């Protein structure tokens, strides 16, 4: 694993970061550009950014080296060779280098609303895992965003006339408390680091997508008494459309492993943040 620490810009040399935003990235530098633009627009600005790259792309490295010169946040970059789905391994590595007491997890295909980090931070509670939803952008809108880098295409009125899915999740009600208590998504959740360490982080037995990076985390956090709180209509993010492979086999393999984990009933995984 390579870990690169980019120096702080002068704007944040005096800041004490207590929040770490962990971004799981895979190849798409064009998506990363849009994410960074959305980070620069954040209303809450006292956080560090950790790029957790499941690859060792020279393009990503070059992008981050260029970006850190004027970027108003500390950036850390960790990477690993692209040897299949190893997201949980990567996320545990990211947790180890995170300086923040509070961790926010997103994926590298999601543009953030300007209030995204603030919404997570203002709703943070010691024994609560906060989880949001996402707006599913249609292919045409995603392509426009990649080409133009213009966030005007994210306005509700423009999206209203597209094939974007879950558009209701783009509506922001800052004081709304959702009734939903299940459904953590790995692309949009936050929790205190000490709680993630208490369950020994992400279970690296999951070597296929689905379940391991969110559903299993939800299960084990609940077992140690952490309450789940949905932040729908806050912590808004927009998922960029991209091709995906058929996931029938992933659902089967990951689902069967998850069922075994449920039967074991353990809150602390053996093959996680610390190897037991």
Ranges and model annotations:
Residues 38, 53-64, 110:
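A conserved acidic beta->alpha catalytic loop
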Residues 188-191, 195-200, 206-226:
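A short, conserved alpha-helix in the catalytic core of glycosyltransferases
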Residues 150-182:
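Short, flexible, basic/aromatic active-site loop/helix in glycosyltransferases
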Residues 37-46:
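Short, acidic, metal-binding catalytic loop of nucleotide-sugar glycosyltransferases
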């Amino acid at each position: 694993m390579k870990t690169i620490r980019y120096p702080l810009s002068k704007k944040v040399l005096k800041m004490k970061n207590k929040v770490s935003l962990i971004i799981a990235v895979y190849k798409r530098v064009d998506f990363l550009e849009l994410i960074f633009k959305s980070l620069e627009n954040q209303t809450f600005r006292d956080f560090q950014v950790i790029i957790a790259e499941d690859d060792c792309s020279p393009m990503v490295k070059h992008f981050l080296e260029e970006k850190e010169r004027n970027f108003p946040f500390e950036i850390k970059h960790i990477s690993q060779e692209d040897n299949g789905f190893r997201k949980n391994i990567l996320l545990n590595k990211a947790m180890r280098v995170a300086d923040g007491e509070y961790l926010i997890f997103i994926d590298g295909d999601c543009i953030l609303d300007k209030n995204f980090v603030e919404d997570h931070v203002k709703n943070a509670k010691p024994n609560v895992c906060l989880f949001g939803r996402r707006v599913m952008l249609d292919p045409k809108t995603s392509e426009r965003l990649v080409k133009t880098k213009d966030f005007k295409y994210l306005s509700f009125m423009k999206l209203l006339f597209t094939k974007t899915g879950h558009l209701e999740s783009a509506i922001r009600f800052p004081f709304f408390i959702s009734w939903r208590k299940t459904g953590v998504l790995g692309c949009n959740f936050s929790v205190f680091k000490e709680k993630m360490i208490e369950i020994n982080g992400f279970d690296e037995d999951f070597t296929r997508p689905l379940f391991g990076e969110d559903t299993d985390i939800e299960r084990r956090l609940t077992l140690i008494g952490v309450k789940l709180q949905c932040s729908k209509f806050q912590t808004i993010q927009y998922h960029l459309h991209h091709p995906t492979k058929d996931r029938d086999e992933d659902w089967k393999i990951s689902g069967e492993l998850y069922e075994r984990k449920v039967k074991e009933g353990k809150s602390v995984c053996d093959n996680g943040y610390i190897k037991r």
